[in-house]
Amino acid sequence: MRLSPAPLRLSRGPALLALALPLAAALAFSDETLDKVAKSEGYCSRILRAQGTRREGYTEFSLRVEGDPDFYKPGSSYRVTLSAAPPSYFRGFTLIALKENREGDKEEDHAGTFQIIDEEETQFMSNCPVAVTESTPRRRTRIQVFWIAPPTGTGCVILKASIVQKRIIYFQDEGSLTKKLCEQDPTLDGVTDRPILDCCACGTAKYRLTFYGNWSEKTHPKDYPRRANHWSAIIGGSHSKNYVLWEYGGYASEGVKQVAELGSPVKMEEEIRQQSDEVLTVIKAKAQWPSWQPVNVRAAPSAEFSVDRTRHLMSFLTMMGPSPDWNVGLSAEDLCTKECGWVQKVVQDLIPWDAGTDSGVTYESPNKPTIPQEKIRPLTSLDHPQSPFYDPEGGSITQVARVVIERIARKGEQCNIVPDNVDDIVADLAPEEKDEDDTPETCIYSNWSPWSACSSSTCEKGKRMRQRMLKAQLDLSVPCPDTQDFQPCMGPGCSDEDGSTCTMSEWITWSPCSVSCGMGMRSRERYVKQFPEDGSVCMLPTEETEKCTVNEECSPSSCLVTEWGEWDDCSATCGMGMKKRHRMVKMSPADGSMCKAETSQAEKCMMPECHTIPCLLSPWSEWSDCSVTCGKGMRTRQRMLKSLAELGDCNEDLEQAEKCMLPECPIDCELSEWSQWSECNKSCGKGHMIRTRTIQMEPQFGGAPCPETVQRKKCRARKCLRSPSIQKLRWREARESRRSEQLREESDGEQFPGCRMRPWTAWSECTKLCGGGIQERYMTVKKRFKSSQFTSCKDKKEIRACNVHPC
């Protein structure tokens, strides 16, 4: 007895992926299955078109995300590969991504979006447009698509695949056909240590780094610095694992410090070049003034660099200006894959990080060096209430920039010879080799012809070609290389959603015919409304010409005129304006009448929409003098609007400012206050008194020298009397002095009338080494006699000059 095979329906539990293979055979579904399909309301009700039971084959098939990450960065692009290990194969598949613990029966259950790489291999499912399936059922061993990670706050996501090998054999959803990715905490971006494996790739690869700044008043309005906002020049390199330019948790080098605080890449480049054995390419790109404007999207700063097996990492940084020491960049980004190949594309959203050298908390905080220096760390929304990124709820910081790293060529023998997609065959066509002209000197060529039209007539990738002729081969034993050159290109007619194409305005009406009678030419124009988002050049024509015939027949009254001259510049720099052109009468009419032919024409002209291109500005002036005469200051430069009335409001900065450093400021000598005047050095007659001051700060850096530290002035005591009574008094004092001297010799201390004194102390050190200083010594009372009537029993102090020789 033959049983009808029961149709199989994909589980609507945590399974996130289903695989469908359209087969020619008609399938019979049970009523129960159809009821379940109807209950799903038509949203991704996926019926697996296979007649059989699920097989165990998870060692044969695998679902991998390039780099094998456990976390995803919101908005980043990841290459997803579904493959079969030879000799296994598969004919059909389905790939889908859902939020964790979601069933997939609602639109909001799905996470991220897929991008098709090869339309001949893959397509979106007609009944479930968020899922990817095969374009045609045939034997294959691998397919690839890009998955764009969902926005912040999505949580964990599960990618799942189902595979149909034959009509009665299928594998679904579990084991190696499932990949779980969780959202990466932006505050830990790049902080977690990740092992850098030895690279096994062969040959070299060439990449282009493109930097898209997104830091603007619209995206980051709090305290946004309207003046002098900019990104400094990009500096970095491709290097080995033995060299670190910068890393989270490490300390900034002097080069990193100068980039972070001054925006100067000079020291950083010097440090990189000193590591010549560990560095393959120094990466440099221009600065952006201001930090965001449309031209930064159309022609974003970019730089090309190469990597090899030893030097397969790349790092770079650029300063947000003005800021204390804030930067963005990548550290040790590995471009080598575990499959011994080279990563095709890296897209990273960037948040700012602190270099740990300045403690400012706002864009324009005054200089405040961090002592001791702190480690490099990412900024967070809870750092400081005055921070422009502060959020009391602790949310993630909005990305300030995006960097795109694309592989543009591979050179030399490659280990992984399977192309990542069909476009690799075009993308890897010899652009690397064109950097060095290896044409033998014995081969003489003509110049290259112009590039041909793109081979694709629709908005798809194609090739264009140019040729040259071999004029002479001077040595027949030396072969001459190619006479044809190919380059990838995009065909015309792309839609507005295509980031690599232009958006054009409608054609302006045809101009008048160039002649007043007979056959002439006319033209019309259009303008670029939106340049390509990827910064490529717009190749679509902006002008068309065609022949025109004026019905009026040329008669004897007709005149001969020259060709029209070139059109004058449009009277407006943006929006609608007028332009003129002129011609001259070469020969007047034969009948002597006036020439009726036009000799001047005027027509409307359309420039790009106002504020979509940079303003028409004069060149920058020279930098002004530093705002200070010594130490740290600021300097500025200006530019002017060339056509203010026509342009209207212009948001471009007309002034720039940067830090400047001059020699240290002089420090003058600092002195203490004057001391009190000393006692007069004479008890009668003329004498002098002294006062002093001390040096508290010696002069530095050419400061004012120290003035005098000792001053003298005359003093007069009572007149010295010579009367007998005075003479007797002196004799009495002399007698008492002799008696005191005797007592002093008898005792261990000195004795004055009425008291006994201790010996004089030693003289103090001189207050100056030269130019006149003073010394002091003291005598103190040791014992007072009760019967003494003398009042001179008190502590004594003596002062004398010292080091009076000139300095």
From Swiss-Prot:
Protein's name according to its UniProt entry: Spondin-1
Domain TSP type-1: 442-495, 501-555, 558-611, 614-666, 668-721, 754-806
Positions of the Spondin domain: 195-388
Residue ranges of domain Reelin in the record: 29-194
Family matches, as NCBIfam families: NF038123_dom
A Pfam family this chain is assigned to: Spond_N
Protein location: Secreted, Extracellular space, Extracellular matrix
Disulfide cross-links: 44-128, 156-182, 199-336, 200-340, 202-415, 443-480, 454-489, 459-494, 502-538, 513-517, 548-554, 559-595, 570-574, 605-610, 615-650, 626-630, 660-665
Signal sequence range: 1-28
One BP annotation, GO: positive regulation of amyloid precursor protein catabolic process
